[in-house]
Amino acid sequence: MSNSIIIIPSRLAATRLPQKPLIKINNKTLIMHVYEKAIQSQIGEVYVATCDEEIASEVSNNGGKFIMTDINHTNGTDRVFEASQKLNLKDIDFIMNIQGDEPMINPLDIKNLNKLSKEKSLNISTLAYNIEKNEDYDNENIVKVITKNKISDNSISEALNFHRVIKEDSYDNIYQHFGIYLFKYSALKKFVNLKKSKNEIKERLEQLRAIDNNMKIDVLLANYFSSGIDTKKDLEEYINLLNK
């Protein structure tokens, strides 16, 4: 059976929500909310990849593992790859990248993505969910994925494109994309060695580098809602959700 590892990229230099990973939510920092969800999935070891000593200390002080990475990375996937190189992973075939601002991600969805991707030997896979509100189509902080076919429980479809803003009726199969990817190690290595594509730069979405270079991304439907924390409004909504 092939083995997996989870690496969570995280840094302090967020423009929309300063010091985001260290914001306390119900007496726990955002990065530790994400770390604990990853641990609960039980698919493999979990590390935080960061260039900031403050994040490293927070993770370490709470019993977690971290890897220090270069400050100059412009996206999470490059940071994840550097961490994987430093870990010298000899027995790991799959590397999961969970973005450090996805505290709502459900451990069961993490586990299901890992299980189905391994069974079908997918090179790159990710999760999506049905869009819940019409205004989400215009919200650039909620990334949308267009799939080739409709996805339902345990079905998989190829991602055709990703957008930050899109018209609701422009395509048949539009879903909310989650900040999580499972890579075969070989696919991750190929991805980080590709040049940034024009669409990637235009949309500020690193996954478009794969699409633009004919690297297939398979999309699975998540069973539970999740949304990244990018703004103060996102943060307030997450706190309200926890306190219900």
What are these model-predicted stretches?
Residues 12, 70-76, 224-226:
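Short, acidic/turn-prone active-site loops that include or flank metal/cofactor-
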Residues 50-51, 105, 183, 230:
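A conserved hydrophobic position in a structured secondary element of the catalytic/binding core
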